Amino acid sequence: MNNPIKMLISGADMGSLIASCALHHDFHESSRQEDKFQIYRIEKDTLTMEDVDACDLSGVRYAVNATLHDNEASFAFDEKCKEQGITVIHAVNLGKTAFLAVEKPKGYPFSEVVKKGTDDFRCSLGKYISQYGMFWQMPVPWVDEAIMHYSKESFTQQGIGAYIAAGYCDNILVNLAEGKEVKYFPKFYLSPLLEEI
């Protein structure tokens, strides 16, 4: 019997969806895969520095940051994980869209998305996605629309994007656990509810 993969999920609403997906994942496809995920939770959408200081990272292989990313403590959580060599997955609900980024311990910092003294996190993230798409000549105009909508009214934490993010996050966790390739930040995963093919 192999050891379970220990992971820490921060975030209450979307964090619970991600935990549920991970707990119900079937590893039957791989004979060498560990038995399951062992999940530890910080059930808060807004972290404090006290939460970050108190979280025990011993034995944790992966961390998921599904918080609102609305203060410095959220990014301090990432840094604490990275200092311990832990890969951090960021899951963000953008209404009817999900954004996910995988941050290597020594990779490009996800906190660079938010420039100090500028817009809130989701607006900064929308600008990052839009500029990334324009640079690679793959524009994503619906992201601009989603962010414009968000500036007028906030996203529900349990909206469609949260469910999409939970499913994607589970797939990323399984790929990491099985040693399969994933995209690392500054690359990212972006999934609208429906996309023309």
State the predicted function of each range:
Residues 1-24, 29-31, 170:
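Glycine-rich adenosine-cofactor-binding loop
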Residues 1-8, 13, 175-197:
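Phosphate-binding loop/pocket of nucleotide- and phosphate-handling active sites
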Residues 4, 58-60:
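Short, well-ordered alpha-helix to beta-strand connector turns
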Residues 8, 61-164:
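E1/E1-like adenylate-forming module used to activate ubiquitin-like modifiers
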Residues 21-25, 79, 175:
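Short, well-ordered alpha-helices that flank and scaffold nucleotide-derived cofactor binding pockets
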Residues 28-47:
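NAD(P)-binding Rossmann-fold cofactor-contacting core
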Residues 50-58:
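Short amphipathic alpha-helix with an adjacent loop that forms part of the alpha/beta core around
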